[in-house]
């Protein structure tokens, strides 16, 4: 191995960005095939390649950061900037969905009956499952902060407990959201209301699944003693992401469920 005289990580060539992009193409094309032709082959193939890519890419990052020591303070600083920029890009993603919702709801067209919700749409009661979902996500925000503080204080047992509770709450939220979708009287094809509702809440639901997976990886890593009180950027990034998901849900709840109904 050559001697390195700088603090930066020269990343080796990796196939995972390419396989990840291909899996994303398969999943999006597969969703179109599933929605229009009721064929699940492509979307399942996309999910499989995505899971395989995710596993191997995460394995490489863990190997580089934990076992090879490539994640120096300078590299960690760069990773932090990267995560912040990624979350900002996600904010703009959701801004587009909120824009579509408010554009349609603040000045409803005659085709919608000149009112919001549109004529014939029976919105979900914001005081039932959506309120429970809000409580679940707010509680998970508390438990992830508890996990972070426990890690900083070197309390491994409490960190694992808090992280497990957070992941469980994330899974519970996903199940509640799935049951809500199943029971909704309208679908994604029911005009602009159905489109904006399912696109915004569905995209948020996808982020909850991604965040839960991220936290589950952190849980497994903590079981193997990968984190210390001063070297745990993987967990820190997951916690930031989870707080972002929390905040987006509050905006969704107030805008789409409460005001929009």
Swiss-Prot record:
Span of the signal peptide: none
The keyword Transmembrane helix is assigned to this record: yes
Localization, UniProt: Mitochondrion inner membrane
Listed GO biological process terms: mitochondrial electron transport, cytochrome c to oxygen; respiratory chain complex IV assembly
One GO CC annotation: mitochondrial inner membrane
Biological role: Component of the cytochrome c oxidase, the last enzyme in the mitochondrial electron transport chain which drives oxidative phosphorylation. The respiratory chain contains 3 multisubunit complexes succinate dehydrogenase (complex II, CII), ubiquinol-cytochrome c oxidoreductase (cytochrome b-c1 complex, complex III, CIII) and cytochrome c oxidase (complex IV, CIV), that cooperate to transfer electrons derived from NADH and succinate to molecular oxygen, creating an electrochemical gradient over the inner membrane that drives transmembrane transport and the ATP synthase.
Family per similarity comment: Belongs to the cytochrome c oxidase subunit 3 family.
Protein name: Cytochrome c oxidase subunit 3
Origin species: Dugong dugon (Dugong)
